[in-house]
Amino acid sequence: MANVVVVGAQWGDEGKGKIVDWLSEQADIVARFQGGHNAGHTLVINGETYKLALLPSGVLRPSKLAVIGNGVVFDPQAFLDEVERLTKQGVAISPENLRVAENVTLILPLHRELDALRENASKATAIGTTQRGIGPAYEDKVGRRAIRLMDLADIDTLPHKIERLLTHHNALRRGLGLAEFEAGAILKELTALAPKLLPYAETVWRLLDIKRREGKRILFEGAQGALLDVDHGTYPYVTSSNTVAAQAATGTGMGPGSVGYVLGICKAYTTRVGQGPFPTELDNEIGRKIGERGREFGTNTGRPRRCGWFDAVLVRQTVRTCGIHGLALTKLDILDGFEQIEVCVGYRLDGKEIDHLPAGEGAQARVEPIYETIEGWKEPTANARSWAELPAQAIKYVRRIEELVGCPVALLSTSPEREDTILVQNPFEA
């Protein structure tokens, strides 16, 4: 399989950034296909820490082409700020190595403000968004009123498109008793941004099709996780886009046959940020210990992540909905030293055992985990780079996960460092 898709197999924050960076050495192109700057990656390369939000991880690899696809929602100011920050760290970013889909939807200040207003209106209705305007921007995209990157190149039609957008947003603001946005101010802002952004604009579907026909390897980089998918996740506590592997095609303009190998990333335990069901959550000393050892705080928001035992039911479900061929298991080292480790192998709902997470919000909140206890290990797995360096019991744990989720482990990560990775099966050669 020439191309590889990387998706999160849990609720995001699984360590996709490191795995994508590690795989990007073998790729010619790294393409983002959904989400926005709400999904943070932390990469450690030769002791230097890089934090990415909107940019594909491929920008850290010289000679690689990074692409932001049409399925992404694109915040111009966040983009420019991230480019500036990484440039100060010595990363070369220019239109030569980064292209942005000309039909990508823009996130504007009015989207961020609306997102925050909704999220802070009531704790009862809060979803746990990052308040960065992601959801409102996707709403405008579906509502056919969004401003897209290509619109900045047509100054004659841009004012009309802004007026159309404000017809909707100012009606909302009047209902909320807020001052209306002025079209002139938005036009001035976008006109000033245009010369900084348009050099990156590209007909991405055509570019990728040409590269594919030339035999170039494409690595599709997903954001967040499959359990946050707007259709297949824990609705309504989800993101506003499709995060499953099939979106790699839609979000870049490629055909489904171009996707290739699907690599699912999951931690050796489970975490979640924000609201929503979490069957294996540990609201106790063990959960806090996992969080502290794993440094479980959001890259973008700094919010502490909720922590719990590995949930084989959920990962098995995402293996199916994403068509995952192999898993990359991360943060195995965080479980070093635990005498016993619990793994969720099923659920109990209203007295009955079930083998999947139900779609209903109420049922999701009522499921109880059924655990299997596995003996832990005392020897360290941290920084291991081969199976021979792993404790026997840690290997048994990995093998049991493979059995429970019905999918082999292709990669094993034992630290944030790029090189601390054990390769079982190369996704590009599978």
UniProtKB/Swiss-Prot annotation:
Top-rank EC class of the record's enzyme: ligase
Metabolic or biological pathway, per its Swiss-Prot or TrEMBL entry: Purine metabolism; AMP biosynthesis via de novo pathway; AMP from IMP: step 1/2
UniProtKB keywords: Cytoplasm, GTP-binding, Ligase, Magnesium, Metal-binding, Nucleotide-binding, Purine biosynthesis
Cofactor binding notes: Binds 1 Mg(2+) ion per subunit.
Residues reported to bind Mg(2+): D13, G40
Cofactors: Mg(2+)
UniProt catalytic activity: IMP + L-aspartate + GTP = N(6)-(1,2-dicarboxyethyl)-AMP + GDP + phosphate + 2 H(+)
Ranges annotated as spanning the membrane: none
UniProt binding sites for substrate: T299, N300, T301, G302, R303, P304, R305
InterPro entries: Adenylosuccin_syn_GTP-bd, Adenylosuccin_syn_Lys_AS, Adenylosuccinate_synth_dom1, Adenylosuccinate_synth_dom2, Adenylosuccinate_synth_dom3, Adenylosuccinate_synthetase, P-loop_NTPase
Gene3D superfamilies, per the entry: Adenylosuccinate Synthetase, subunit A, domain 1 (3.40.440.10), Adenylosuccinate Synthetase, subunit A, domain 2 (1.10.300.10), Adenylosuccinate Synthetase, subunit A, domain 3 (3.90.170.10)
Listed GO CC annotations: cytoplasm
GO molecular function: adenylosuccinate synthase activity; GTP binding; magnesium ion binding
Locations listed in the record: Cytoplasm
EC number: 6.3.4.4
Alphabetical list of NCBIfam families matching this protein: PRK01117.1, purA
General function of this protein: Plays an important role in the de novo pathway of purine nucleotide biosynthesis. Catalyzes the first committed step in the biosynthesis of AMP from IMP.
Quaternary structure (record): Homodimer.
Family membership: Belongs to the adenylosuccinate synthetase family.
Name by which UniProt lists this protein: Adenylosuccinate synthetase
Organism: Rhodopseudomonas palustris (strain HaA2)
